[in-house]
Amino acid sequence: MKPTYKILVTLISVSIFTTACKKQAPVCTSNCGTINANGNVINKQTNTNALGVPVSLSWVKFVGGFSQKEVIATVNSKIDGSFNFTSNIDTTYFSKGYFLSLSVGKSNDYIVLGYSGLIETRTYVFDQNAFQAKQFEVYKKANLKLKLNRTLKDNFKSYAIAHANVGDFYLHNYNVQSPQEVLDRNTSEINIETVADVYTKIKTVKTFANGTSTTTLDSIRCTTNSTSIYNIIF
């Protein structure tokens, strides 16, 4: 049986692999093989069809911790969430260390969460049936603005802000090393894309020079078509 891999990608604040190069793959002129990709994209939160989400077929290779990507084709999911397209690929790419990736991306209305939901599937050999009846999972997008208000006079060592939306996987959004750095950065607002219609948890940790710390945990329910605002006073 030819190997095809479904990928549940874990996103962390500092990614192990970084996309170094992304470009359009050249049109195949020799050693071509035809491959069809079809399936559907759903909103994982509601198990309903997701319209207008980009699905891409790409060559990917990791070199020294960086990825090289050549996009072969991209289509958007239809009103019923489906996608179906056929591409000619240069099969010699497999012998050059590339694998073939079918992945879903974010759109104006949806975001991808690599730590929750299938967003990519791969094949490392030419297999015309590798990308049949695939289902990708995305989440409805909501916009959240964190407003930072430095009003206290305490002298902290570091101040970290993180958020979580589905589960307890926290993404770090901001970390400063001193009160003065807040002023130096001149950062008063942080814009976040989060999941709509669920409670986004906001966690702050203030650490002092003596090793003690204080933690706050709160949440806000964000909706689509508007920007929710959460004020952080520290």
Residue ranges and their predicted role:
Residues N36-S82:
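Post-signal-peptide N-terminal segment of Sec-exported extracytoplasmic proteins
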Residues V27, Y115-K145, S213-F234:
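Extracellular beta-sheet/turn segments enriched in Thr/Pro/Gly and aliphatic residues
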Residues D90-D127, K206-T215:
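A short, solvent-exposed loop/turn motif at the edges and junctions
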Residues G64-N88, Y170-R185:
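Short, acidic Ser/Thr/Gly-rich low-complexity loop/linker segments typical of extracellular
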Residues C21-N36, N40-Q45, A130-K141:
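Beta-strand-rich domain onsets/edges
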Residues I79-F99, Q180-K203:
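Short Pro-Gly-centered beta-turn/loop motif in secreted/extracellular proteins
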Residues T46-G65, L152-H172:
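Short, ordered, surface-exposed loop/turn motifs in non-cytosolic proteins
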Residues M1-K22:
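Sec-dependent bacterial lipoprotein signal peptides
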